[in-house]
């Protein structure tokens, strides 16, 4: 990939996270990159395609990690704990990401359809989710967890993790004390969500 293309992606990600998709123009991206707008359209054709080129790798991480723990010799519940831990770690790297994802899905519901078709249903990208789906069904059949669809479990986990990072900015400022309190809050939320999901999987 040429350096100018990488720079466009980097600047676009920064502006999308700061201003949202609708609040960011390709003209603004071009100005920040130091290139003309035609060059952005040459590489990415549309702002929508640029958006997905920026954020698809992050969405892929969300789904692909479903497969990572499944190769290890852990029981299912322990793997669920590791998935939640990974999602919190991923979102902690840039806490603007979770509010951005939630806002974009609310403003542009069609993006959820794109996410589902590309990352959960397409033949190539759905392998990790397919393995996760199979494991959930096996655990249900063994009687170790209650009846639940894999997609419902994944969405429950995603919603709970995302909401923690959406709410966190509301109660804390930027001082050192607030940063520490925020970190402690997120650690508590991770523990609470893990307990909630794990307990919710148990058969009644």
Predicted regions: what they are:
Residues 86-89, 93, 126, 130-142, ...:
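C-terminal peripheral helix-coil segments that are non-catalytic and often amphipathic
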């Amino acid at each position: 990939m040429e350096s100018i293309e990488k720079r466009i992606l980097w600047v676009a990600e920064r502006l999308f996270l700061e201003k949202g998709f609708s609040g960011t123009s390709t003209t603004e991206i071009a100005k920040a990159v130091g290139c003309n707008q035609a060059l952005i359209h040459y590489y990415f054709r549309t702002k929508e395609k640029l958006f997905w080129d920026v954020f698809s790798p992050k969405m892929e991480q969300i789904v692909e990690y479903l497969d990572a723990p499944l190769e290890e010799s852990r029981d299912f519940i322990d793997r669920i704990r590791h998935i939640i831990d990974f999602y919190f770690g991923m979102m902690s790297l840039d806490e603007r990401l979770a509010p951005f994802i939630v806002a974009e899905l609310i403003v542009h519901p069609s993006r959820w359809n794109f996410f589902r078709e590309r990352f959960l249903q397409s033949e190539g990208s759905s392998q990790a989710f397919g393995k996760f789906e199979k494991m959930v069904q096996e655990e249900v059949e063994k009687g170790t967890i209650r009846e639940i669809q894999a997609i419902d479990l994944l969405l429950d986990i995603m919603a709970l993790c995302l909401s923690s990072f959406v709410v966190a900015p509301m109660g804390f400022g930027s001082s050192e004390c607030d940063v520490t309190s925020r970190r402690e809050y997120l650690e508590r939320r991770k523990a609470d969500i893990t307990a909630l999901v794990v307990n919710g999987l148990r058969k009644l």
